[in-house]
Every structure is written in C-alpha cells, then in structure tokens.
Amino acid sequence: MSGLDLPWIASVAGARRARRAGRIQSLWAGYGELVRVDLDDGRTAVVKWARPPAGARDVSALRKRRSFDVEPAFYRSIAPRCDDACRVPALLGARGDGDEWLLVLEDLDAAGFTGRTDEATGPQLDRVLAWLASFHARFLGEHIDGVWPTGSYWHLDTRRDELAAIDDPLLRVSAPLLAARLTGARYQTLIHGDAKDANFCFSPASVAAVDFQYTGAGPGIVDVAYLLYGRADEPASGVDDARLDLYFDHLRTALPATFDADALEREWRGLYVIARLDFCRFLAGWRPAMWASDARGQRFVRANT
C-alpha cells in the first residue's frame, strides 16, 4: 500500500471520513510510524502503521514481524478485560497481512492521558507500579493464546545473536540458567514486556499503558526489574527495596483475598536479582559499547554472579 488507508480507518472508527493529522513518532528501526488521525465527527484516533523494510527477513526482522501479530491479539482478546486499574486504549480496528499492519486505537490524549515522561518519580512512578500490579494480578496463572510464550523483547530464545556477542564469559554461561529460573517460576502471569516509562501515559490522577508488541508469559517481577533499571536514584546495590515494597503492596491489594500472597511475594521478590541479571545479559550483548560504560550494571553483575 502506498498510503495510509484512511477510508478503512474511518470505517472501523465509526466515522465517514478520516484525515491524517500528523506523525506522533516513528517506530523502532524505521519499521513504520505512529499517526494521529482526525475523524469527521470531531474525534481523533491513533494509528500504528507498521511497514517492515522490503526483504528484511533476518532474526531481528522476524521477531518484529511476530510482534506486530501479537499486539492486535492483545487488543482483541486481553484488553477488554483491563479496567481503569490497568487502563489501556480501546481497539477500534486492526488488520495485517504479513507485510503491513494497521492498528487503530483510542486516542489516550483525548481521554485525558496527556502526560509523558522518560523517568517517572514520586506519585507517577507509584501509579505505574500499581498499574503493573493490577495487570499481573488479573492474569495470574492463565495461559493465553496469541501472545509470546515468554514475554519481553529481550528474552533469551529470541536474542541468540546478542548472547554470542557478550564478552563476559560468566554472564554468557549464566544466561540459560537465568532464563530457566524465570520460565520455571511457579507463579506465571501475563507481563507487559516493554514496561518502560515512555510507554505509560498519565492523567492528573491515573495512568494508562501502550505498546503491547512483546506481551507474554512470565513472572511479574520481570516487568518491575526492567522498569526500575538504571533510575537516577537507584540504590548502589541495584535492589530498590522501597519501590519493591510499593509494588507488592499494590499486588496484595489487587489479588483475591484467598490467594497466598505471601508465597507469591517470596518467589517474585527472590527472582528480582535474577530478572535484573537477565536484562543485564541482554544489554551486554545488544550494545557492548554502551554496556562497557554502564558501571552500575557491571557492578551488579559482579556482585550477583
């Protein structure tokens, strides 16, 4: 397709006409763009328009293509079960043919979620932790088709090239053991898979999440370890007990009263170091030069392997 299919977008959004209002941002590695459209009834919508480069069929390209199938599956079957405690945009329409994907979503800005940040602090970070806790509690123990068997964009099975690029032999050898600890956890849930600050949109009193290309199974602490990695006020140990306490307080509130929250917290809190090491493993192979300057990450690896 040479251009954005505005008639189809208008149709699935319940409007007569749609007009491209402007680009919000490009997708990773030039794989498309996020576009805002104006509808003739006064509403707006956000369109994720993914168009992988022609002929891109390497491991990285195939992973991204799979992610463009996963996200519509999330919005079709999982998003309707998310309420205000783990708010996500509503799906208006989706289609994909293996070479191009269109995802038409509610415009969260129009719903009041206009705030963005590269590093949430204070009440904003607490809201993100509460969102994650609610999401993790909601899907605890469920097997959900259509998403990744193992959630997160850095999980080992899809990052073999990065594994081979790791200079640290101990971290490289430890990688499958770390992955096995996470996939073998007793308490599995649905994780966001890319729970960085930039994927949360804030209203004055709440928060919503976007970008579910890498959602899949895993212990919820994987999302938390990723979210808390490398923050400006991170403790020297790399283990932010105060914020972990906040997350587990929110998780206990979200879980059914009959659930053994103590056992869940023991396992997931005990896996925090493992989840953080697993992300360090990815960083070390993905961007070796950047990892070489990550003194805190390297110190954490030395202290925990």
Model-derived features with residue positions:
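Active-site acidic catalytic loop and adjacent metal/ATP-binding pocket
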Residues: 28-39, 46, 178-222
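Conserved NTP-binding catalytic cores of kinases and kinase-like/nucleotidyltransferase enzymes
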Residues: 1-98, 203-207
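Active-site activation/catalytic loop segments of kinase-like enzymes and analogous catalytic loops
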Residues: 73, 220-256, 274-295
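Conserved short submotifs of the Hanks-type protein kinase catalytic core
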Residues: 100-111
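Short alpha-helix boundary/capping segments
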Residues: 63-67, 119-127, 216-219, 235
